[in-house]
Amino acid sequence: MEGQSVEELLAKAKQEEAEKLQRITVHKELELEFDLGNLLASDRNPPTVLRQAGPSPEAELRALARDNTQLLVNQLWQLPTERVEEAVVARLPEPATRLPREKPLPRPRPLTRWQQFARLKGIRPKKKTNLVWDEVSGQWRRRWGYKRARDDTKEWLIEVPGSADPMEDQFAKRIRAKKERVAKNELNRLRNLARAHKMQMPSSAGLHPTGHQSKEELGRAMQVAKVSTASVGRFQERLPKEKAPRGSGKKRKFQPLFGDFAAEKKNQLELLRVMNSKKPQLDVTRATNKQMREEDQEEAAKRRKMSQKGKKKGGRQGPSGRRKGGPPSQGEKRKGVLGGKKHSRPPALGGKKKGVPHHGGKRRK
């Protein structure tokens, strides 16, 4: 029994070792192409096993992927290794397969105004050397920048032009001109950036006119500006004949949380009475008077507009020889006099008007 058990153990160990070798060693009819720089293995063998697998080749696909991965790992173990911070690493070679880009190619930079002008006129840039001979110092110096040749800022004497003011400081004028050139270059640079990003420039994106503002809008804007201080307009100075602003602010009075149950009951009952009452809440007299006032204002605005047009036309005459905007002739009828109705609405309820008999009542404001 002991001999059989030893033989069985040896056979089992031999079988396990063979299985391990079988897992590591993979045989292929055609050798795989490896690109170790990208950790890529290309299998050119025909997939005969997959064709025989039928409609569900998942197991065959897993086995094929495992074999190809094993071959790739075997190639990695053949690479030279080195120790980096107590870790053994393998240095991969340069990749041989060119992979596609993750992102699209960068767009070309938009041309500046000078580049567009140069392309239009056919101007080609000429390459200049950085160093030039300076006759004053007798040595080679830079063409631009610090310690450049023919540096006029280092001159201690400046000739005053004949057309210039003899009392003007030419040194300060030169510094001021240089600052203006720097500011102009910066403005052109910002314009090029805005043109490249398709932004709207301040010249065309500034504040636009809001049209004519009425008296109410101006008063509201003035009131808002006055209460925009830290003291909410309490210590704001007023003009000599300026009126106090109406409705500038009222403190909200809250009812007590506990105590006055009678007043609370009264308010709730009043609210229920108003909600359950069938009487309409609209004041007909007030609504009618408001409508009449609006119509009067519209007609007054129209008459004012017509009178302004007549003043603008002046002494210009029509084809009949009569001045435009002048009084009508005897044969014509005036609008709003006998023969025409001035208003097509009923008289005001309880109101008072010129030329209309008063029927009593007061006009509510």
Curated annotation (Swiss-Prot):
Pfam families from the UniProt entry: RRS1 (PF04939)
The keyword NADP appears for this protein: no
N-acetylmethionine: residues bearing it: M1
Spans annotated as Disordered: 200-255, 272-365
Positions with biased composition (Basic and acidic residues): 235-245
Post-translational modification (record): Citrullinated by PADI4.
Gene Ontology CC: one annotated term: condensed nuclear chromosome
Annotated InterPro entries: Ribosom_reg
Feature: compositional bias, Basic residues: 302-325, 340-365
Similarity comment text for this entry: Belongs to the RRS1 family.
Assembly: Component of a hexameric 5S RNP precursor complex, composed of 5S RNA, RRS1, RPF2/BXDC1, RPL5, RPL11 and HEATR3; this complex acts as a precursor for ribosome assembly.
Entry function: Involved in ribosomal large subunit assembly. May regulate the localization of the 5S RNP/5S ribonucleoprotein particle to the nucleolus.
Record-linked PANTHER family: RIBOSOME BIOGENESIS REGULATORY PROTEIN, RIBOSOME BIOGENESIS REGULATORY PROTEIN HOMOLOG
Protein name: Ribosome biogenesis regulatory protein homolog
Organism: Rattus norvegicus
Name of the gene this protein is made from: Rrs1
